[in-house]
Design a protein with these regions (language model features):
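Short, functional N-terminal and low-complexity linear motifs
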Residues: 43-53, 102-108, 153-156, 172
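Conserved catalytic core of two-metal-ion nucleotidyltransferases
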Residues: 68, 75-83, 89-91, 131-172
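N-terminal regions immediately upstream of nucleotidyltransferase
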Residues: 1-95, 113
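Preference for short coil/turn "hinge" residues that link or interrupt alpha-helices
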Residues: 63-64, 70, 98, 103-106, ...
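Surface-exposed loop/turn and secondary-structure junction residues enriched for glycine/proline
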Residues: 64, 108, 113, 169-171
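Active-site nucleotide-donor binding segment shared across nucleotidyl transfer reactions
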Residues: 79, 83-131
Length: 172
């Protein structure tokens, strides 16, 4: 391996790590969310975090930062926001449900103004026990200002849909 190419790769990785740290500190965001006393306060805090990160990403774009780093940075910010929104819900059985990023967002590529494609994956086909928590999660996401494209399916339903539709298979 050429040392010059290694240095270039290390610099690119360091720049991406530096950008992620600059955009959002997950620990700090989690602590701030835990200290929110109302839903309105949580919404304002999450909206502000997204707006601040977007402003940094916009500035980095103007400074010719790699587009790849920018779209990965944007996805990383949304990852943190979704973790908080998901964690605020009262899940009847948190081990039988999962939030899965799919599509471009699932690849870590989130362009400005893109929708955020999510699969809410359940162990069983009947997910009525989760209806209220899913509704609360999606409502919180929409209130934050996120454009969510979502589906709620069991593993078996995902397999059936993927067998029928190649676009579902590639999105998964």
């Amino acid at each position: 391996m050429n040392f010059d190419s290694l240095s270039i790769k290390e610099a690119a990785v360091n720049e991406t790590v530096s950008l992620s740290a600059e955009l959002l500190d997950p620990m700090q965001l989690g602590e701030r969310a835990a200290n929110c006393e109302s839903s309105a306060e949580l919404l304002a805090m999450l909206r502000d975090a997204i707006a601040q990160a977007s402003a940094i990403l916009d500035e980095r774009y103007k400074q010719n930062l790699s587009i790849t780093d920018i779209v990965h940075g944007r996805a990383s910010v949304i990852d943190q926001v979704l973790r908080i929104a998901w964690g605020r819900q009262q899940w009847p059985d948190q081990f039988s449900i999962a939030l899965v990023a799919v599509g471009g967002y699932g690849r870590g590529e989130l362009l400005p103004h893109s929708d955020i494609d999510l699969l809410i994956l359940t162990r069983k086909e009947k997910h009525t026990a989760y209806k209220e928590a899913i509704s609360g999660f999606l409502t919180l996401c929409w209130d934050i200002g996120l454009e969510i494209g979502q589906s709620v399916r069991s593993v078996k339903q995902c397999q059936q849909e993927a067998a029928k539709d190649i676009t579902v298979a590639t999105a998964l």
